[in-house]
């Protein structure tokens, strides 16, 4: 079970991934929770660079890809050991943020993602959709990833991906309550994996 959570900052994805991890663990599932960028020792160093330093859009993409490649090795191992792997951001983030947000192009980012991940695709992705205004209010601050026009392009990128991959990407209305969104997440996970819990 490989599940990713996507959305612009302030969408509530990090809250939902924690709630799903708790839900699965209470029911005896082995769960590993990771985030991007980061998730490995070197990946966390890359995360620090991305969050604290100004880099070009292409350099930003390659740093994300390097972090992702390191993490995929661990993810494959966890999956082979029967863990449910829950990941806060993955390839869809690069397509949305770098492909659409930074205008590097959807196709090139998808090709590079495929190369960096050896083609590892999540079984299920939850995209928590909120409008940019709501997300910015929730965050209460702007960093360089969160300029309004940029986030509008990112959001559009996510919506394009959701339309292209409806079998994998479930769009959830992020304006609803945390509990309502969690119920939908659990319902979908139970449906996909025929869980009786």
From Swiss-Prot:
GO CC terms in record: cytoplasm; cytosol
Membrane spanning residue stretches: none
GO-annotated molecular function: ATP binding; dTMP kinase activity
Lineage: superkingdom: Bacteria
EC id: 2.7.4.9
SUPFAM superfamilies named among the record's database cross-references: P-loop containing nucleoside triphosphate hydrolases
Statement: the UniProt record of this protein carries the keyword Nuclease: no
Pfam families: Thymidylate_kin (PF02223)
Gene3D superfamilies in the record: P-loop containing nucleotide triphosphate hydrolases
Keyword annotations: ATP-binding, Kinase, Nucleotide biosynthesis, Nucleotide-binding, Transferase
Residues annotated to bind ATP: 7-14
Catalysis: reaction(s): dTMP + ATP = dTDP + ADP
A GO BP annotation: dUDP biosynthetic process
Family recorded in the similarity comment: Belongs to the thymidylate kinase family.
Task of the protein: Phosphorylation of dTMP to form dTDP in both de novo and salvage pathways of dTTP synthesis.
Protein name according to UniProt: Thymidylate kinase
């Amino acid at each position: 079970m490989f599940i990713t959570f996507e959305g612009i900052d302030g969408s509530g994805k990090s809250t939902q991934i924690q709630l799903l991890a708790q839900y699965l663990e209470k029911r005896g599932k082995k769960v590993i929770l990771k985030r991007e960028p980061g998730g490995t020792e070197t990946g966390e160093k890359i995360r620090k660079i991305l969050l604290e330093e100004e880099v070009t859009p292409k350099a930003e993409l390659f740093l994300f890809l390097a972090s992702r490649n390191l993490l995929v090795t661990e993810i494959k191992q966890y999956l082979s050991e029967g863990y449910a792997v829950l990941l806060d951001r993955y390839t869809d983030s690069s397509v949305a943020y770098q492909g659409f947000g930074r205008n590097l192009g959807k196709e090139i980012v998808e090709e590079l993602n495929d190369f960096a991940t050896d083609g590892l695709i999540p079984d299920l992705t939850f995209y928590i959709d909120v409008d940019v205004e709501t997300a910015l209010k929730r965050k209460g601050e702007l960093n360089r990833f969160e300029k309004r026009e940029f986030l509008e392009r990112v959001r559009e990128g996510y919506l394009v991906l959701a339309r292209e991959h409806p079998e994998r990407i479930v769009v959830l209305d992020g304006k609803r309550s945390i509990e309502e969104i969690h119920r939908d997440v659990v319902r979908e996970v139970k449906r996909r994996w025929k869980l009786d819990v």
